[in-house]
């Protein structure tokens, strides 16, 4: 599916104390006001419990960051003598009036990193301080990419795993919207990794969040997820498997789930391309720690990218098996399914071929082999990640889709082996070399135009030509957002008090 990124939080920052503009005197103060709204939205978001409440709040955070982003871009252009911050792409908007901003003091924004390894994120006051508006803009764009990925994830999972089975139109609309969000996130991360404007930020930053290799890897990861979602839109096997597990679905009383013929060979090539994107992301994320920084990217993200590549290759093997089964080669199709299970680290429960039986050891060697297989399986399960699902609820099981793909493989293998044992009786070839001999991938996503930062419209620029008004913003305490998920009010009650009450009276 899509990785659930944590959104960073930030401390209070006053632009008017460090910047001034003689062309638009109200610009620094307006930027401070918009940033304060974003800061409150991020704090409120991370205090919500994971699940539906946090997913529903994403639109509020997106609205706040879209309102604030043009102000930061205007400040950056004003400090850049009115020139666009990215000279590699032509600007789509031209201002009738030029923005000039002067720097009176050093601007030092503070942001909490969310991709750094857990060993560096352990302290409660782990914000990193940067210098310049480049640092602020880089973190804002990175956060925007996380929000778009989170919107894509929540939209797909809430539709596919709803209590009522979605229609084909609902499924298509959800996947198309999620793909659009992921493509936007990919262009943003690519812009951060390639723009020379952020070169000084990446060199000075000690955390891996803003490193060019990290941003390039996140761009590839978003492309891998978008490609897999494109395949998922027409993957009737996953839909049938989810519908079979849905306790609220009653369509089976009327008719069996329809599984139309799919363009199996094309889908397999698309999944291979998604695997190539995911492997590029995993390599890039793993290499960040070797660039002389204090810490690398969190292992959960790197493991997720690695497992996502395995899931994509396993899905490609499944579609090759479907293609063989549609051609009447059910034995070859079963071999492809077992190759897919091997790629996922799942043990084959079906009957093994004669070649596989003769190569198995006996005694202690066989016991060691079983322990090694279980250890590798647990490692892949840990790397796939997961989310909490309410008791009796329906959910994907893990972030990378490994568990869902394993269910589909088990369903197809059980069906095909039964048919082969009773009707076809075809020999099942060895699946040892199937994954290694996969063809190259094929792109399905259209080329995306380079990301262009938004600019303020002429009406708002005209309003900021006047003098600033008195602004009173309470920075508040930064201790309240030290944790991403706040504890409930009743969890920290006084001993002897009734949980959930503010008083501590005895009765």
From Swiss-Prot:
SMART domains: BRO1
A Pfam match: BRO1
Family note: Belongs to the palC family.
GO cellular component terms given for this protein: ESCRT III complex; plasma membrane
CDD domains linked: BRO1_UmRIM23-like
Role noted for this protein: Required for the proteolytic cleavage of the transcription factor pacC in response to alkaline ambient pH.
GO terms for biological process, alphabetical: cellular response to pH; penicillin biosynthetic process; positive regulation of penicillin biosynthetic process; regulation of secondary metabolite biosynthetic process
Listed name of the protein: pH-response regulator protein palC
BRO1 domain mapped to chain residues: 1-288
Domain of life: Eukaryota
Chain segments carrying region Disordered: 375-405, 439-507
